[in-house]
């Protein structure tokens, strides 16, 4: 049994650990409902690069700390000019270029807007009894993404 922590975002916004061939990635901004800022996007991208690169890793699991999976984009960070998209992998370091190996979204609590996009970019979803999904931007006629319903 192997278990090791890997460094990710310097701020601790993304936590990464390995356990028995599984890369466990935690979005760690519970006070902000795990909203995606620049550090989260970069941290997830680095974690998924590690998943693709390391042969002993077979699968990734992505989840959120606290009571929400992910509330979507951090609008304060976006308004402050933070780069929310990773140049290689897109929004949240995942949406435009998911990893080659399977990625499971472990959802408990809310997955809203961009958080729901993250779920859709994963290969599999496991949802707890408290999982809730939504696209609140639709009510405001805001749609900035084209959904990919099939994987390549």
Map each language-model feature to its residues.
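CoA-thioester-processing core
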Residues: 90-98, 106, 112-152
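Generic recognition of short, well-ordered alpha-helical segments
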Residues: 38-39, 73, 117, 147
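Hydrophobic/aromatic residues within transmembrane alpha-helices
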Residues: 25, 62, 74, 118-120
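Glycine- (often His-adjacent) and acidic-residue-rich active-site loop
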Residues: 32, 64-99, 111, 139-141
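Conserved CoA-thioester-binding segment of acyl-CoA-metabolizing enzymes
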Residues: 1-65
